[in-house]
């Protein structure tokens, strides 16, 4: 079964970084869904139709960037982007929500925006964050995957090993150079099935120079290598 993955997309440059990361996850067996959250409905019917059509066009452009025009797309109406994405993830049975970094992030750095930060505090779905300007890479591979040495949740190494195609003992550490993805587990005090970072993991997220995937406590993600990615 593929790993259903929602990409939060609003047409901004940094959300194209999220598309780039989503495409790399697709090469590992993820099935992608694009989502845009509208915060208010228009009181006038004509304006509401126009707003809905504009949101649909925006998501269509995102699917075009992915070179996958049949990618499922959802326009969500919610006062909170984080809440709207959380509810969509629960409804769709998604395992991951992917974000770009905050709009003011320096190239190559990772900085979760407000919505990502909210999901990182207790959401029942894994969260992935792309570094700024990831979209500029011709290809994003996930060959060199790192985990923190002190991560106590076994699902972290399990998931990272599947992504990298190596045994857990061969995974990189965050200090290693040329990392393609950092996988972080949720802290020991986190409710099972939810996301929650320890202070140490939060620091690793803030200093990361690669995409970051934060897993739910006790929940591994069963990625698969697609034939196209290994041929």
Regions found by a protein language model. Give the residues of each.
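Short, surface-exposed alpha-helical segments at coil->helix boundaries
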Residues: 48-60, 157
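Small/aliphatic-rich secondary-structure junction motif
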Residues: 1-47, 71, 132, 141-181, ...
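Glycine-rich, Arg-bearing micro-motifs that act as flexible, cationic patches
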Residues: 99-118, 184-207, 217-225
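Short glycine-/small-residue-rich Rossmann-like dinucleotide-binding loops
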Residues: 10, 102, 124, 150, ...
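Short, structured interface segments
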Residues: 116-136, 212
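Charged docking surfaces used in two-component/phosphorelay signaling
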Residues: 76-84
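Active-site phosphate/pyrophosphate- and oxyanion-stabilizing loops and adjacent acidic/basic residues
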Residues: 20, 60, 64, 117, ...
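Glycine-rich phosphate-binding loop signature in dinucleotide/nucleotide-binding domains
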Residues: 90-95, 176-177
